[in-house]
Amino acid sequence: MKKFGLLACAALFLFLTGCTEDPAPETRVTPTPGRVQVEITALPTATPVPTPTPLFLPRDDKGNLDINQDLENSLEPTSFPLAADTVILLYHTHGEEAFRQEKGYTYKETGESTYKTLETDKSILALGRLLQQELKGMGYTVLHDETDCEPPDIYSAYSRSLQVMEKYPQATVFIDLHRNAANVKEKKDDVVLLDGKRCAKMFFVVGTGIGTRPGEYDIAPDWQQNYLLAKSMTEKLREADPELCGDIRLKVGRYNQHMSPYCMLVELGHNANTFADAANTIPYLARAIGVVLPLLPAEDAP
């Protein structure tokens, strides 16, 4: 009787506590009559969510980006027909930029920097006048604003050139004409020969507006559209000479390109080029605009 009582107590203890020396079954419980069969299976494995490929990747710590190659390949150069009454605004965020001085081309420097002048017939403004003249001869309506946006601080010049753009609500195409940065230390023949003339090289800058910190810009540009415009221009210019137009510079900045999907920031020549080199490139730039942004006949305007 005592032995039976001890066994019964032990069985009751094991039942209540679930303690047992035998390992628990790993996959299946043997069916018992009158009881529900329970099958133990592994939990389903979550399907990993693929990380989307970014549209661009940092190239360096200077704000340069590399565009996603698949996106780059999908952007086929094209043309963007414009209504006959489209207004183009030509302006200069850095309007004091000038070129290498030589006989017949000298100027008084601003004192703030070499290769800069307030003499508008010697600065990048003079090239803007040439481009305006070329485009007007092709039938375009072109406004050329010569406001000096650099003073008092070049680092805030884009805030002032934005004010210039906002003065012309009728404009839909914006061209910000620059000379590339003054960092070439020696005279060099960095030109291409076209029709027997020395022509300065050029390239386009496109701003993504992602900024260097969250919330830096309240409105981001349609950078893919502006990139496609720049790519179409680049390909057209390279038909004249493969080296005439360099690769597009994709940047983290905005460069006021949120104002329109038809914004072009043009870097024409550099400080070691002559003014004549840069002036010789203007007709090729104008012709490329004529092909990529053709004017529709007035009766075909949307």
What is each stretch, according to the model?
Residues 243-302:
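Active-site-adjacent mobile loop/cap segments within catalytic or ligand-binding domains
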Residues 29-172, 179-190, 279, 283, ...:
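N-terminal catalytic or cofactor-binding beta/alpha core of small enzyme domains
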Residues 1-5:
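Positively charged n-region of N-terminal signal peptides that target proteins for export
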Residues 89-91, 142-144, 173-176, 203-205, ...:
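Structural recognition of the beta-strand scaffold that forms the well-ordered cores
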Residues 222-249:
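Active-site-adjacent substrate-binding region
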Residues 20-22:
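Bacterial signal peptide processing site
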